[in-house]
C-alpha cells in the first residue's frame, strides 16, 4: 500500500473521496464525528484525588501526622482528632487552589488555539483547527501554522520550517511532484505536516491525517513528558522558602529545647515544635502566587490580552519601552481608498472608468493581484487588499465575475523584504504579470508609464512627479500603494520582477484609533517610551505618530536603510530620541530591541507577520495580533492581543503591575503574620514563660489566615495611580531590605499585642492566657489583611472597594467565634470560656496594630501631598 506522499494529487483526492472544491458542511460534520477532533492527546493529568493525596507528601505534614499518632497512643485523643481534621482541611484547601489555578491556565490555552482557512461549501472560510477533518481543502499562506498533515495539490513557491519534527531549522521548498520511492519524513516534499510553520509562499493542501494520526501525533507522548516550568518569581520564592525553612527549623530546635527545659514533656515539646514549624513555614506562598497570577491572567483575557506564559505577567510590570506596529494597533485597520494618481492626475475612486485603458489596468491589478475576498459582506484577508476590492464594488463591479473568468497562473507572494507581490494571469491569450507594493520597491523596476495617450518610456521627470505625489499623499497620513504590470511569457520569479509599466498610485486612509492618543499619554505618564515601527513611508508614519502623541518636538524618524547605515554605537546614542521607524526589515526590529535592552530596558515588541517571529522572541514581551496576526507570530509571542489594540497593551501593563503588587502584598501578609507567631513563642521560651499557644492553635491560625485573606488581597483592583508610577526595576526582587523591615516591624507589632493579651490572661490562669493569646493573634492577623491590601490607607482606598477582603474577614471572625464560644468546640481546640470583658479586650488589642499602621499611612500620605 502506497504512502500518501507516493500518491498523485488526483489519487489522493480519490482515496479521500473529495474534490478540490472542498467538503460540504454535512460531509465535514460526518467526518468530524468519525475521526474526532483534530487535537493531540495530552499526558494524563493527576485526578483530583491524586492532587489531594499529594498534599500529604509535605515533610512537615508527615512529621505532624507521626506526632499526632504518637499523641493518640499517649491518650490525647481529642487533640489528635483536631490535628487530623486541620491537616485534612488544609489538604482540601490546597486541592481546591491547585484545581482552580489549573483550570484558569487551561482556559487561557483555549483562547490562543490556532485557526485554519478551508474551502467548505465552495467558499473560503476560517475555522478552529480542532474542527479540521481528513479531506478538508486547506489554504496555506506565509505565517500560517500547519494544523494537520496534508498532500499539496497546488503550490505557489511554498516554503515550510519543519524543525519541530525534523530538527532541521532551514526552510524546506515544497512541490506537488509525486515521490515514487520510500523516503524519510524530511524528504517528503509533496507533503506538509502538523506543527510546521509556513515561512513563504502559498499552497492548496488536502488534509490526509488529523489528531493523533499525524506525524507529530505519533511523538505526542514524548512531547507531553515535558514538565511545566516555574516562573522566575516562583523560583525566587522557592529559594527563599527553603532558606526560611532552615532558619525556622533551627528556631524550632531551640524552642523544643527550651520547652523541655521549662518542664514540658518530650511529646508535648515535640508536638509544639512541629506545629510551630508547620505554622511558620509559608508553604502557601507558591500556591498563592500561582492563584494570583492565574486570576490576573483571567482578568487580562477578559480585556483582550491573552497571556501564553506566566513569566510575561511578571515582565509586564517592568516594561519601559513598547515598540508597536502602526497599522491596526495604533490605527483602526479600516482602510478606505482616498486619492488615486493615474494618467498623471489625482482622482477619486468614483471617477475610475473601466473604459479607460489605464484605469482598467489599475482596476484589474487591484482585484486580481489580491488574496482577500468578501463573503456575505465581510472581508476575509488583509484590510489593505479588502479596501481595494471595496473600490471595485463601489463603482458597481463584481470582483467574483472577473476572478471566475481569469485564473491565476503563477505568483510571488508579498514579503517584508521585497515589499511587493506579483501574480500572473492569462488575459485574451496574453500573459499579464501584475504587481503592487511600496513605491521605492517598484518605481525603479519600471521602464515605461501608462498615460492618456498610451504607453511610453518613463522619464526621470515622470519619476520625480510620481515621487512628489507619493510624498504629498504620505504627508496627509495616507498609506500609498504603487501598481505596475507587464505582458510577458517568462516564468514569474523574484528575478523576473522588472521591466514593468507604471500604472498609478492608490492612497488609503487608516485613521488612528480614538483611544490611541489617551493610551500613548498613559504610557508616557507611566514612564514607558512608546515607539512606532511600520513598513509604511517615513512621512506617513510621522504624520500619524504626531497625531497620537508618539512623535514630539526633538524626536527623530528613521528608515530601515538609515538604520542599516548606523553602527551599534551610533544607534545607542540616538535610540532614546528615535520615536518612529519606517520601512523596517525583520533584522531592523531585532536591532531595535537589542539596542533598548543594552540600555537596561524591558522591551515589548508587537508583530503580526511570519518575519516578526525572531523579534517577538527576542523582546522581553512579544505581543502578537489576534485578528491580523499569523499563527507563526502567535506561536512566538508571549501575549496575544485579541483586538489588535495598543490601548490593550497599556491595560495589560497596568494589570501586570497590579498582579505583581498584589503578590507582594499577599506575601507581606503571610510572612508578617508568621513572624508574629514566631516572635511570641521565642519571647516566651527565652523568658521561661509558659508556652502561649497549643499546637492546635497554630494549625488553626495557619488554616484560617493562609487561605481566604491572602487570596482576597490577590483580588485587589488596580489603583488609580498605578500608571503614574515608573516601571519596576526587574533586578529588584520582592524581598528587599525595606520589605523585610516592614515585614519584621509589622510582625513584631502583632506579636507585642499578642504577648500583652497573654500576660493579662496569665493573671487569671494559663488556660485563659493561652486562649486570649490565640484569639488575639488570629483576630490581629485577620485585621492585618486590610493593612496589606495597599500602601495607601484604608480611607483613601475605600473599605468596601474589595468585598473579597470583607468576606474573608467575616468568615475568619465567625470561625474564630465558633471555636471560642461554642461549648463542644472548646475542648477540641484547647480553649476555655472567656468573659465578655476579656473578649472585648481581645478585640481592642487585636485592632491596635491595624490602627497604628493605618495612622502611619495617613501621615505618610499627608507628607507626600
Where are these regions (language model features)?
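Membrane-water interface at loop-to-transmembrane-helix junctions
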Residues: 729-747, 767-771
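Conserved cytosolic headpiece of P-type ATPases
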Residues: 1-724, 734-735, 759, 774, ...
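Internal transmembrane alpha-helical bundles of multi-pass membrane proteins
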Residues: 718, 746-747, 751
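Generic alpha-helical transmembrane segments
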Residues: 705, 750, 771-785
Amino acid at each position: 500500500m502506497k504512502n500518501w506522499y507516493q500518491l498523485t494529487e488526483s489519487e489522493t483526492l480519490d482515496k479521500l473521496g473529495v474534490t478540490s472544491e472542498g467538503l460540504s458542511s454535512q460531509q465535514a460534520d460526518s467526518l468530524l464525528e468519525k475521526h474526532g477532533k483534530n487535537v493531540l492527546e495530552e499526558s494524563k493529568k493527576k485526578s483530583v484525588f491524586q492532587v489531594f493525596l499529594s498534599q500529604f507528601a509535605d515533610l512537615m505534614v508527615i512529621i505532624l501526622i507521626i506526632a499526632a499518632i504518637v499523641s493518640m497512643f499517649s491518650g490525647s485523643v481529642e487533640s489528635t482528632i483536631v490535628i487530623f481534621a486541620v491537616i485534612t482541611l488544609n489538604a482540601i484547601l490546597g486541592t481546591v487552589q491547585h484545581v482552580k489555578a489549573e483550570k484558569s491556565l487551561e482556559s487561557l490555552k483555549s483562547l490562543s488555539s490556532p485557526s485554519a482557512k478551508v474551502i467548505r461549501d465552495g467558499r473560503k472560510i476560517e475555522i478552529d483547527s480542532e474542527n479540521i477533518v481528513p479531506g478538508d481543502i486547506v489554504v496555506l499562506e506565509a505565517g500560517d501554522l500547519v494544523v494537520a498533515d496534508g498532500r499539496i495539490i497546488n503550490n505557489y513557491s511554498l516554503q515550510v520550517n519543519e524543525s519541530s519534527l525534523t530538527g532541521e531549522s532551514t526552510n524546506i521548498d515544497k512541490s506537488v511532484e509525486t515521490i515514487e520511492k520510500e523516503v524519510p519524513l524530511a524528504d517528503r516534499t509533496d507533503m506538509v505536516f502538523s506543527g510546521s510553520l509556513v515561512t513563504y509562499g502559498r499552497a492548496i493542501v488536502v488534509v490526509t491525517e488529523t489528531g493523533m494520526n499525524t506525524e507529530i501525533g505519533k511523538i505526542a507522548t514524548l512531547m507531553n513528558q515535558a514538565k511545566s516550568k516555574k516562573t522566575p518569581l516562583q523560583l525566587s520564592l522557592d529559594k527563599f522558602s527553603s532558606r526560611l525553612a532552615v532558619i525556622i527549623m533551627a528556631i524550632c530546635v531551640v524552642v523544643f529545647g527550651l520547652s523541655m527545659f521549662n518542664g514540658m514533656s518530650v511529646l508535648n515539646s515535640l508536638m509544639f515544635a512541629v506545629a510551630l514549624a508547620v505554622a511558620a513555614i509559608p508553604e502557601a506562598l507558591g500556591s498563592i502566587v500561582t492563584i494570583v497570577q492565574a486570576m490576573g491572567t483571567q482578568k487580562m483575557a477578559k480585556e483582550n490580552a491573552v497571556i501564553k506564559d506566566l513569566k510575561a505577567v511578571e515582565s509586564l510590570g517592568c516594561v519601559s519601552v513598547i515598540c508597536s506596529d502602526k497599522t491596526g494597533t495604533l490605527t483602526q485597520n479600516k482602510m478606505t481608498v482616498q486619492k488615486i494618481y493615474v494618467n498623471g492626475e489625482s482622482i477619486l475612486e468614483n471617477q475610475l472608468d473601466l473604459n479607460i485603458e489605464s484605469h482598467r489596468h489599475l482596476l484589474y491589478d487591484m482585484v486580481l493581484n489580491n488574496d482577500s475576498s468578501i463573503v456575505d459582506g465581510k472581508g476575509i484577508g488583509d484590510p489593505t487588499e479588502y479596501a481595494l476590492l471595496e473600490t471595485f464594488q463601489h463603482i458597481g463591479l463584481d470582483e467574483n465575475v472577473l476572478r471566475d473568468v481569469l485564473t491565476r497562473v503563477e505568483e510571488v507572494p508579498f514579503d517584508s523584504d521585497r515589499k511587493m507581490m506579483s501574480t500572473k494571469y492569462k488575459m485574451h491569450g496574453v500573459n499579464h504579470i501584475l504587481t503592487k507594493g511600496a513605491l521605492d520597491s517598484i518605481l525603479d523596476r519600471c521602464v515605461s508609464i501608462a498615460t492618456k495617450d498610451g504607453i511610453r518610456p518613463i522619464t526621470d521627470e515622470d519619476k520625480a512627479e510620481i515621487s512628489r505625489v507619493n510624498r504629498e499623499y504620505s504627508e496627509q497620513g495616507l498609506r500609498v500603494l504603487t501598481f505596475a504590470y507587464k505582458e510577458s511569457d517568462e516564468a514569474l520569479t523574484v528575478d523576473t520582477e522588472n521591466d514593468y509599466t507604471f500604472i498609478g498610485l492608490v492612497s488609503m486612509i487608516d485613521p488612528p484609533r480614538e483611544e490611541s492618543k489617551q493610551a500613548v499619554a498613559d504610557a508616557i505618564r507611566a514612564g514607558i517610551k512608546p515607539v512606532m515601527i511600520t513598513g509604511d513611508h517615513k512621512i506617513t508614519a510621522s504624520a500619524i505618530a504626531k497625531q497620537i502623541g508618539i512623535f514630539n518636538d526633538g524626536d527623530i524618524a528613521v528608515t530601515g536603510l538609515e538604520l542599516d547605515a548606523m553602527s551599534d554605537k551610533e544607534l545607542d546614542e540616538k535610540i532614546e530620541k528615535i520615536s518612529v521607524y519606517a520601512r523596517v526589515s525583520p533584522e531592523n526590529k531585532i536591532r531595535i530591541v537589542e539596542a533598548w535592552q543594552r540600555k537596561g530596558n524591558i522591551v515589548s515588541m508587537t508583530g503580526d507577520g511570519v518575519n516578526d517571529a525572531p523579534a517577538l522572541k527576542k523582546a522581553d514581551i512579544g505581543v502578537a495580533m489576534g485578528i491580523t496576526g499569523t499563527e507563526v507570530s502567535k506561536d512566538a509571542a508571549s501575549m496575544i492581543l485579541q483586538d489588535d489594540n495598543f490601548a490593550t497593551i497599556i491595560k495589560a501593563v497596568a494589570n501586570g503591575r497590579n498582579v505583581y503588587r498584589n503578590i507582594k502584598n499577599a506575601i507581606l501578609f503571610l510572612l508578617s503574620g508568621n513572624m508574629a507567631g514566631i516572635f511570641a513563642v521565642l519571647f516566651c521560651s527565652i523568658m521561661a514563660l509558659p508556652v502561649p499557644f497549643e499546637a492546635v492553635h497554630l494549625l488553626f491560625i495557619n488554616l484560617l489566615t493562609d487561605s481566604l485573606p491572602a487570596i482576597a488581597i490577590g483580588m485587589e483592583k488596580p489603583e488609580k495611580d498605578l500608571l503614574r508610577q515608573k516601571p519596576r526595576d526587574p533586578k529588584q526582587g520582592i524581598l528587599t531590605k525595606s520589605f523585610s523591615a516592614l515585614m519584621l516591624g509589622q510582625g513584631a507589632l502583632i506579636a507585642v499585642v499578642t504577648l500583652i493579651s497573654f500576660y493579662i490572661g496569665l493573671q487569671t490562669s494559663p488556660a485563659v492566657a493561652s486562649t486570649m493569646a490565640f484569639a488575639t493573634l488570629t483576630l490581629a492577623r485577620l485585621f492585618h489583611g486590610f493593612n496589606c491590601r495597599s500602601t495607601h490607607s484604608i480611607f483613601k482606598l475605600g473599605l468596601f472597594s474589595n468585598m473579597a477582603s470583607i468576606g474573608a474577614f467575616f468568615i475568619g471572625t465567625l470561625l474564630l467565634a465558633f471555636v471560642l464560644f461554642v461549648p463542644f468546640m472548646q475542648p477540641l481546640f484547647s480553649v476555655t470560656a472567656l468573659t465578655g470583658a476579656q473578649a472585648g479586650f481581645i478585640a481592642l488589642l487585636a485592632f491596635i496594630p491595624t490602627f497604628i499602621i493605618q495612622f502611619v499611612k495617613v501621615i505618610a500620605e499627608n507628607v507626600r501631598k
